[in-house]
Structure formats: C-alpha cells, structure tokens
C-alpha cells in the first residue's frame, strides 16, 4: 500500500517548460503540489473564519501567496525575459524599436488619475521640478532596469548634474538637482529651449512633477510586491509568528553567487568593493552638487573668472551638441555595448543557446546520476529521506492495522447492541399491548361508574334542594318579624331625636342671650377700667417730663419692656397658631362625628341600637362643639392680647423717642451751663449771670443741679422697683395660666370673661409708670381672684348642665365674640403726652 501518488501529467509539462534559473524552485513547488493523498482532482479550498464566515478575497490571495500557489517574487526574473530562447531576439528588437530622439522618450502610458489631476491645474501653471533625495531606497535591480531604459542622454545628464549650473538656467528653474531623474528633467527643459527647431512642438503641459510622483509610487508598489509584508494567516486566524514573507528570497547577487560557485569570502570582498564604489560616487555627486549650489545665484551680467567662463562655454557647446547625429550615434553605440555586456554577463543562465554550457551540464548530470545509484528504486520522501516501496507498505500496515482492529471491535459491539435493542423493542411492544388492554377495560368501567354516580347525584340534589327551600322560608319569616320590630324601634328613636333637638335649640338660645348680657356688662366694666387707667396714667406721667435722670431710667425700662412685649408677641403668635391647629382638629372631629352619625343611622336599620348609645354619641358631639367654642374664645382673647401688645410697643417706641429728645435737651442745657461758667471764669467772675440762665432754662443753675441730684437718686432706686414689678407680673401670669388650665380641665366650657379681664389688667399694669406699678399689680390681682371665683362658679354650673345633657355654649361662634380692645388700654395717647410737655415748658 503506497501513501504517495504519481506525479500528474500537467505538473510534468510545467516542469519541462521552466527556465534554467528557476528550474530547481519550480520543480520543488510542482512536486509539492503533486504530493496528494489519492488521485482525486484539486478542489477549491474553502477557508473560513472562526465565526463561520468565509474569508475575503484579499485574505485568500495573501494565504495563497504565502503557501506558494502563485509565482512568488523569489521565483521571478529580475533581468532578461521569461523565455530564454527569445532573449537575444527580444533585446535586438527592443534596441531597434527604441528611437534615439527626444520625442521617443515621452511617457506613452500615464496613469489616468495623474492626467486628470494635471488637467485640473490648467496649462498656465508653472511647475517646479521635484526634489528627490540622493539616497533612494530602491534596490539595485530597479536601478539597473532604469539605467537600461534611460535615454541616450542619461550619461550626459549625469555629468550635467555633477557640474555647475549657469545663471541663465538658475533663473528658469528655481530648483536643486539631487538625483539623476531630476537632472534629466532639467536637461529636457533646457534642451527644448536651446533647440526649438529640432522639436518645434509647443510645451502645453508640464507633467514632470506628476510623473516623478507616479514613478515614486510605482517604485513603492514594486517594492511591496517584491518584498511583501508577511501577514501570517492560518485559516483566517493570526498567530504570533512575524517576519517578512521573502525570508529566503533569491536576489540577483545570490543567484550570481550560486551559479558562479563563488565562495563566501570572495562574495564579501565583492560586496565591499561595490560599497566603496557607491560611496565614492555619492561623494563625487555631493561635491558637484555643492559647487553647483555655490554659483547658482550669480548674476549673469557680473564679471566672473576666465576659467569659469571657459567652463561655461564648453558646457554650452556640449549642450548644443547633445541632439546632434554624432551624439546619437555615440549613444546608440553605448547602448549596443551595454546590451552586449548584459548578454555576456547572462550567458551562464542560457542553457539552450550555449552549447558548451549544455555539454558541461549533461556531464554533471551524468556524474550525479552515477552517484545516485544507491537511491535506485527508492522514493524521495523529502528532507534527504529515500524509502523503498516495501518500507512504505510496512509503515502503512503498521499505521492502518490498529485502526482496522479498532474498527472490527466497534463493529462487534454495534452488532451486540443491535441484538439487545431488538430484544428490548420486543419486550416493550408486549408490555404496550398489555397496557392497551388494561386501558380499554378501565375506560369501560369508568363509563359504568359515571352513569351510577350521575343517578345518585340527581337524587341527592333533589333532597338537598327541598331542605334548603324549607330552611330559607323559615329564615325569611324570622327576619320579617325582626325587621318589623326594628322599624317600630326606629320610629320611636326618630320621635325622641326630634324632641331632643327642640330642647337643645331652646337651651342654646337661652345660653346665647345670657352670654350677650355678660358681654355687655363686661364691656362696660372694661371701658370704666380704661378711663380710670387713663386718669391714673395722666397723673403719674406729669412728674417724669421734668427730670432728665428719671427720663433716662424710663427710657431703659421702656426698651426692656419692648423686648418683653416682642417676646410675648411671639409667644402669643405661637399660641394662636396652636389654637388654630386645635380648632382645625376639632373641625375635623366634627366632620368625622357627622360621618359617624350617618354611619350610625345606617347601622340603626341593620343592628337597631338603643337610646343610650344614641345619647352617648350625641353627647360626644356636643362636647366636641364645646371644646371648639372654647378654643375659639381663647383664640379671640389671644388675638386681642396681641393687638394690645402691638399698640403698647408702638407707644413705648414713641415714648422712648420722646425721652431721647428730652435727654438730649438736658445735655444741651448742661453744656450751656458749663459754657457760661467757662465764659465767666475767662472774664474773671466767680458766678454766672443767673438771669440769663432763668430765661434759657426756666430756673437757676443751683436749682437745676439739685433737681438733677434727686433724679440720680430715683434712677438708683428704679432697678429694685422693676424687679418687684416683674415678679408680680410673673405671679399674675401663673395665676392666669392656672385658671385657664382649670377651665380647660373641665367639661369643655370656655371661660372668656376671666381671661379677657386678666389680659386687660396685665396690659394696664405693664404700661403704667415704674413708681406705681406695684400697687396697680395688687389691684389687678384682686380682680383676677374675683374673676377666678366667677369662672369656677361658671364651670360648676356648666358641668352640672352637661351632665343633664344641656350645653350652654353650642351656638357661640368666633364671629359673635366681639373684641373689646379700645386701642389705648395701656399708656397715654400721643396728644396727652404733647399737652403734658407743653404744660411742663410753661411751668
């Protein structure tokens, strides 16, 4: 059994057609292609990515290029033609067809994109010559190709680039020449200007820059094709192997060394010689370029050296002879000589035209054939391994026999498994038949059971329906009797409710009349108290307008009182907010109670509550209304108190301003007395003029000073009096709070009269003068005690009436309680103060 098939006929045909230079590599690749397992035809490779999608055309092309499907650059020919038989004829034809005129070297095949770009720029645009670097990255093979394809004036252009440029050419072409291509482009422009008769065509378009760019692009493309980047593909997946594809590319030098059988040291010496010559050429070009750049900016009319003029003249004559017949013949001779050199240098590659080389090759082949007799009737496995067909069959049997044994074992196991499957299917079919018979019997039995159960259910249903109907009739009769009893009870409760509502309305009217009478009496009492307080204030305010010290003390006390009033205002505002919140809560409770009454009315139809439960719920409603009326009364008192305090604060501010002006007046009088004393002392008098002092102040200086001393004593006694007054105020406030808590702790009846009287008395005490505050506080405390007694009696009466089910304050609303605040309950009015001041000044 052989693992290697014979070589196909088409591969043998390709092997016979290969040239001498590429015979070895092409035979290897063809033999590799022919080593296929079996004699099947080549199928199109199907390469997919990891995701299952096929690769792109570019990836397939690069993969084929990697594995040698296409002719790689390592197997191509750098010089000459592919067919060695027609090499000499092809060279002769090219030399004959190549015309040695300037017109023949126009580029006939130009990239259409380049022509489009140049035509867009327009014919009037003057293009500068391109500047290319002296050290080009092109390989030596591309340079030799370009040398063979250049015009006959290439050598002259090279010499021209190494010489100096004249001033006339520098004015026309403002560019530097760094390479042979740029020098040739400049030469073509200069020759056109010198010999216009030879080439009379007008210069319509300058494509030099475009062509140079196209040439660079072509060189880069050739380099990419010659040395492509190795993109490592393995069925579309990249690996970590990197490097160039042409790792073992056969260059021209390598092929020359292989065919000439040159040793390694000789090849190295040859490379060194070539490197030195290239460096010399580069240096000479550099020196020539420096010289040309040195004289390019010289003016044409300036005097120059004779030697330079002679060189320029020789150069002009040389340039004028470039297009002559002699130059053309010399150029043709140079081309022929160069072609002969190329043919002679490549004679060792021409296997079919060189008979001597063919004879030597046949001799070498015979000697190699004699040496290879040891590998007769053996197959080349590659890598220097030759095996006989017997060895290959042994290896194949050793590799395949274990596989065949495994196949036989698996076949036996499969047969046993098939037998077991057949037995299992037979047993399964038997059990399935038994199961089907059992199912049929079950279905028939179920049909019988269903009929019997249906009959039994019908009889049970009839009996149960009769029982339910009898029980339902009894329930309906029983519930009808209950409904009649509840309806009679409901009528009785409705009649009682109507009578109770009438009774409550009459009591509310009586209570409202009594409260109105109390309010009128209380208003009269308040007016009398206000008039008495005003009289007392007028009597007490007279002495304080005369004293400076007392005015200062009063100013301080008023400031303190203002702060206390502001604190009281803030506290009362908080209390008002609290009372409003409570009133809103009571309103919510009333709404809830109304909803509850509605629910209770509905429940009366179903449950039939008794009279006691209805009376208890109605009492709760009355209590909530009483609490609401109480909070509204307290709110009205607090609002009245707040307004009184605001007015008191305004009065105190006015009085503080008045006292400040009086203090300033007293200070000015003292300053006047001091100034008069200074004037008298300056004159030498011991006393001042008392008559002038009386006219200005209204009293003598001694009287004024004694009066000020008494004021100072009064000022010293004021703090103790103020402390006592503050203690009295605190006691009164505590008593008022206690009375309110007592009233609130009762059954919810508001005691508005006592609270208002306490507020009036406390406000009157705060605005009276410091000397009389203690006595006024005692009087007000007595009034408060009386009011507390009255409020206690009222609370007792109201509690008794509530127990009886009568509420006195049900019809009282916050709008019905009229405010009794007069606006000037504390302190004196501004007009009274002004009258007092005018009377004091008259005195």
UniProtKB/Swiss-Prot annotation:
It is found in: Cytoplasmic granule; Cell membrane. Residues 33-46 have a biased composition (Basic residues). Keywords: Acetylation, Cell membrane, Membrane, Phosphoprotein. The modification Phosphothreonine is found at residue 720. GO terms for cellular component: plasma membrane. The modification Phosphoserine is found at residues 2, 88, 130, 182, 401, 584, 710, 763, 775, 816, 828-829, 838. Residues 127-137, 163-174, 798-810 have a biased composition (Polar residues). The keyword Acetylation applies. InterPro entries: Eisosome1 (IPR024527). One of its GO terms (biological process) is eisosome assembly. Residues 1-53, 120-174, 718-843 are annotated as: Disordered. Residues 781-797 have a biased composition (Basic and acidic residues). It is a peripheral membrane protein. The modification N-acetylserine is found at residue 2. Belongs to the EIS1 family. Required for normal formation of eisosomes, large cytoplasmic protein assemblies that localize to specialized domains on plasma membrane and mark the site of endocytosis. This is Eisosome protein 1. It comes from Saccharomyces cerevisiae (strain YJM789) (Baker's yeast). The lineage of its organism: Eukaryota, Fungi, Dikarya, Ascomycota, Saccharomycotina.
């Amino acid at each position: 059994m052989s693992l290697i098939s014979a070589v196909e006929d088409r591969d043998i045909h390709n092997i016979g057609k290969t040239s001498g230079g590429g015979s070895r590599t092409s035979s290897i690749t063809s033999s590799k292609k022919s080593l296929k397992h079996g004699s099947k035809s080549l199928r199109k490779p199907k390469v997919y990515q990891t995701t299952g999608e096929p690769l792109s055309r570019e990836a397939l092309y690069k993969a084929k290029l990697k594995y040698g499907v296409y002719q790689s650059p390592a197997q191509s020919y750098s010089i000459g033609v592919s067919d060695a038989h027609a090499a000499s004829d092809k060279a002769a034809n090219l030399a004959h067809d190549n015309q040695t005129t300037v017109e023949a070297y126009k580029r006939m095949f130009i990239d259409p994109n380049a022509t489009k770009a140049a035509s867009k720029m327009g014919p009037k645009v003057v293009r500068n010559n391109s500047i290319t670097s002296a050290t080009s990255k092109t390989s030596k093979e591309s340079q030799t190709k370009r040398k063979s394809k250049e015009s006959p004036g290439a050598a002259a252009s090279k010499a021209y680039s190494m010489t100096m440029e004249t001033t006339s050419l520098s004015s026309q072409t403002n560019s530097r020449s760094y390479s042979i291509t740029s020098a040739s482009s400049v030469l073509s422009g200069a020759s056109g200007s010198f010999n216009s008769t030879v080439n009379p065509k007008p210069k319509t378009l300058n494509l030099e820059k475009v062509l140079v760019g196209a040439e660079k692009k072509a060189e880069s493309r050739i380099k990419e094709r010659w040395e492509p980047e190795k993109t490592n593909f393995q069925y579309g997946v990249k690996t970590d192997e990197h490097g160039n594809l042409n790792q073992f590319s056969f260059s021209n030098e390598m092929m020359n060394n292989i065919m000439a059988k040159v040793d390694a040291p000789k090849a190295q010496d040859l490379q060194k010689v070539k490197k030195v010559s290239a460096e010399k050429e580069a240096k000479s070009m550099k020196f020539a370029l420096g010289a040309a750049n040195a004289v390019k900016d010289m003016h044409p009319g300036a005097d120059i050296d004779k030697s330079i003029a002679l060189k320029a003249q020789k150069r002009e004559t040389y340039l004028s002879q470039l297009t002559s017949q002699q130059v053309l013949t010399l150029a043709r001779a140079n081309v022929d000589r160069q072609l002969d050199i190329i043919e002679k240098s490549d004679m060792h590659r021409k296997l079919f035209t060189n008979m001597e080389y063919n004879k030597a090759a046949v001799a070498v082949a015979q000697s190699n054939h004699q040496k290879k007799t040891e590998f007769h009737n053996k197959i080349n496995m590659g890598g220097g391994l030759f095996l006989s067909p017997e060895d290959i069959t042994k290896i194949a049997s050793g590799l395949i026999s274990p596989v065949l044994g495994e196949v036989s074992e698996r076949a036996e196991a499969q047969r046993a498994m098939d037998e077991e499957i057949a037995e299992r299917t037979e047993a399964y079919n038997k059990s399935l038949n038994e199961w089907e018979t059992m199912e049929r019997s079950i279905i028939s039995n179920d049909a019988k059971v269903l009929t019997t159960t249906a009959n039994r259910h019908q009889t049970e249903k009839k009996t149960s329906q009769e029982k339910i109907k009898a029980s339902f009739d009894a329930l309906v009769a029983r519930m009808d009797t209950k409904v009649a009893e509840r309806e009679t009870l409901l009528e009785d409760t409705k009649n009682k409710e109507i009578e109770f509502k009438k009774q409550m309305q009459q009591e509310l009217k009586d209570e409202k009349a009594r409260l109105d009478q109390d309010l009128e009496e209380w208003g009269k009492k308040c007016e009398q108290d206000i008039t008495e307080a005003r009289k007392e204030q007028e009597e007490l305010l007279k002495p304080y307008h005369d004293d400076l010290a007392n005015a200062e003390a009063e100013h301080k006390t008023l400031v303190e009182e203002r702060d206390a009033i502001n604190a009281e205002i803030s506290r009362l505002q908080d209390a008002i907010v609290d009372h409003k919140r409570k009133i809103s809560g009571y309103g919510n409770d009333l709404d809830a109670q109304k909803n509850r009454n509605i629910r209770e009315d509905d429940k009366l139809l179903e449950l039939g509550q008794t009279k006691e439960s209805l009376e208890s719920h109605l009492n709760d409603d009355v209590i909530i209304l009483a609490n609401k009326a109480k909070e509204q009364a307290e709110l009205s008192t607090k609002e009245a108190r707040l307004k009184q305090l605001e007015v008191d604060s305004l009065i105190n501010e006015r009085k503080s301003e008045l006292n400040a002006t009086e203090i300033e007046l007293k200070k000015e009088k003292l300053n006047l007395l001091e100034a008069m004393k200074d004037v008298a002392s300056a004159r030498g008098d011991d006393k001042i003029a008392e008559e002038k002092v009386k006219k200005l102040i209204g009293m003598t200086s001694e009287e004024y000073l004694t009066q000020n001393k008494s004021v100072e004593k009064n000022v010293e006694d004021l703090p103790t009096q103020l402390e006592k007054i503050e203690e009295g105020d605190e006691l009164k406030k505590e008593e008022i709070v206690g009375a309110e808590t007592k009233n609130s702790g009762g059954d919810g009846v508001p005691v508005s009269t006592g609270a208002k009287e306490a507020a009036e008395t406390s406000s009157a005490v705060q605005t009276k003068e410091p000397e009389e505050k203690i006595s006024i506080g005692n009087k007000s405390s007595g009034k408060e005690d009386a009011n507390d007694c009255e409020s206690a009696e009222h609370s007792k009466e109201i509690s008794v009436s509530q127990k009886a089910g009568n509420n006195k304050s049900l019809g009282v609303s916050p709008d019905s309680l009229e405010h009794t605040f007069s606006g000037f309950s504390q302190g004196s009015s501004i007009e009274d103060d002004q009258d007092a001041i005018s009377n004091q000044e008259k005195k």
